[in-house]
Amino acid sequence: MRLRFYGTKGFVEERSRAHSGHSAFTIEAEGFRLLCDFGQNRKGLLAKIRPDAIFLSHAHPDHAWGLEEGTEIPVHASAITHEITKDLPIRNRVTLEPERTVSVGPCRLTAFPGIHAVRCPCVAARIELGDLVLVYSGDIVAFERPEAALAGAGLYVGDGSTLKGSLVRRHATGALMGHTTVRAQLGWLGKYGVARAIFSHFGKGPIEMGEPALKEALEELATEKAPGCRVAAARDGLSLATEDSS
């Protein structure tokens, strides 16, 4: 399995050479390419990426609105994400039911509801290929059922919006919304024994740190919260095999 990152920043003004594109990455296996999210400023790249299928975690612009240009590629998303994006010219929509596993190419994909936004709910993807299990969180405050989503996973692609300063707040309804910290996510990985993590979707603070400082900070947090977990920062253009040690 190979991962390629085409965009690694969130919906923030800050950008750098390493992080200028909104969220988009592919999972490639057995000649099949699954595109996970496709943010607004990635428009025009579909012809270059040439995915066989697309997964959308939720309908916020920095995750889904690269599809404003339209596509005939199958787009897998929750019912609410399809409803919110109904005006986008997506011609082949596949609805993901919570915790119901479906085949997408050679992979088995299960959508797990997460907490992120009241009007734009998010689902994480648990993707299985043989013995390898990858979990992509999308934007997240928490999983509704963390053990079901994370137990047995070997690789986690997580929300890098903030390292230690919480961006979680309460909606008028009392529901939590926003982004949890990398530190908190590493705590989950330590609890469930996930061996490797790659963070993407970086916010203002992580982008402004620069890559050497960001790498050091991630490693320090992993040592604290998930000893033995190998952690890395994604960057635009990064390509790596899941077997890579970097």
Where are these regions (language model features)?
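Cap/insert and terminal regions of metallo-dependent hydrolase folds
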Residues: F143-L238
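Active-site metal-binding loops of divalent metal-dependent hydrolases
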Residues: T8-G10, F38-N41, A59, I80, ...
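Metallo-beta-lactamase
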Residues: R2, A77-A124, E128-D131, G237, ...
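Active-site metal-binding motif and surrounding structural segment of the metallo-beta-lactamase
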Residues: L34, G39-A77, G152-Y156
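Short amphipathic alpha-helix with an adjacent loop that forms part of the alpha/beta core around
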Residues: L45-K48, V102-P106, E147-A151
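Glycine/Thr-rich phosphate-binding loops of Rossmann-like dinucleotide-binding domains
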Residues: E13, G44, A64-W65, T85, ...
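Metal-dependent catalytic neighborhoods of phosphoester/phosphodiester hydrolases
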Residues: W65-I73, D87, I207-L218
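Conserved beta-strand hairpin/beta-sheet module of binuclear metal-dependent hydrolase folds
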Residues: M1-A47, P121-D139, L155
